[in-house]
Regions:
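Short, Lys/Arg-enriched alpha-helical microdomains
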Residues: 9-11
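Phosphopantetheinylated carrier protein domains
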Residues: 1-7
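A hydrolase-biased, glycine/serine/histidine/acidic-enriched motif that marks catalytic-domain neighborhoods
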Residues: 14-17, 24-319
Length: 319
């Protein structure tokens, strides 16, 4: 019943917390904590499995996986996750050393929650946070299994303006971006990024996009037209392009649609500024079967070299 009444994982997780606490969410002092306990460690278990989402910040990326893990009758591990969009301190902190600073604070939250043994899994930018959290946990004497990163790619492209970031955001939340006026073809975007990525030290200006020609002229014309709308108008169109049966966003998320975009954009900039430092723990690097990315597919082949800059110990790349 709880899952039916609370269709997204965040709503369902809060429902579980409310039931276990025996009080309403309005009375819960932990409501604003970025650490969400999806399922506590079963009796006899020792390990908390902790998930870190990508740049979008919330946990709907893990919906299906959480349901499978929680429903496993032989489960011996707890399941938790960090939701950046619930973390006011995260949203208000500076960008310099952001990922390192947040990783240390998240390690403190895990330790103060009473857990001692961890498996950390991070998707995309969340992989960087998982590494920094693991670093702090190891320094504190905790037992940390090999950190799993999924599509944690080096971010080297910096954009002028928001046009392509808005398209990427729309794809991440399940919007039909073509209905919002964006170019539909991912391949077209990939070709444009491939062409522009080595110019101006990876900084892509809006004029560079507008001046694309030949088979990329469709993309140039699309974004010249998009530029004629205000940012608010573009985001409203993107919001309207989300299907009614979409399971990516909760009702509260929709109310914060523009704010979540700013969080997404900010996380991207923080990832650009991240400099890998030697990490004494073990790493397992995984990639999604779907090799297409809604934004930076041309960067994906650099994943292994990027993580090698971190790994002092064992780095295993899982094909």
């Amino acid at each position: 019943i709880g899952m039916l009444q609370n269709p997204t994982i965040m709503e369902f997780a809060q429902f579980l917390i409310t039931v276990e606490a025996g009080k309403s969410s309005d009375d819960s002092q932990d409501f604003d904590s970025p650490l969400n306990i999806i399922a506590d460690i079963p009796e006899g278990g020792k390990t908390m499995k902790v998930f870190f989402p990508g740049g979008i910040g919330f946990l709907q990326q893990f919906n299906s996986l959480f349901q499978i893990l929680v429903g496993n009758p032989n489960r011996t591990e707890g399941i938790a996750a960090f939701n950046y969009t619930e973390d006011r301190e995260y949203l208000n902190s500076g960008e310099k050393e952001h990922i390192v600073t947040v990783g240390r604070r998240y390690a403190d939250l895990l330790i103060s929650s009473g857990y001692k043994q961890f498996k950390l899994i991070g998707y995309c930018m969340g992989g960087l946070l998982a590494i920094e959290t693991a670093r702090a946990l190891l320094e504190a004497g905790c037992n940390v299994y090999p950190v799993v990163t999924i599509d944690t790619i080096p971010i080297v492209l910096e954009m002028e303006g928001d046009l392509l970031m808005e398209r990427s955001y729309g794809l991440m939340i399940g919007a039909d971006v073509s209905k919002a006026g964006h170019v539909k073809s991912d391949n077209l975007v990939q070709q444009a990024l491939e062409l522009l990525k080595d110019k101006d030290n990876g900084y892509i200006t809006e004029n560079a996009i507008f001046n694309l020609s030949g088979e990329l002229e469709e993309l140039a014309n699309c974004y010249k037209k998009q530029k004629g709308f205000s940012k608010k108008e573009r985001l409203d169109k993107l919001k309207s392009a989300i299907p009614e049966n979409n399971m990516q966003l909760s009702r509260d998320d929709l109310k914060r649609f523009d704010e979540l975009f700013e969080c997404y954009k900010r996380n991207y900039r923080c990832a650009i500024n991240y400099i890998p430092k030697p990490f004494a723990g073990e790493l397992r690097a995984m990639s999604c079967i779907d090799e297409n990315s809604p934004f930076v597919p041309v960067m994906k082949p650099g994943t292994e070299d990027f993580l090698k800059k971190c790994a002092l110990s064992n780095l295993q790349v899982v094909p």
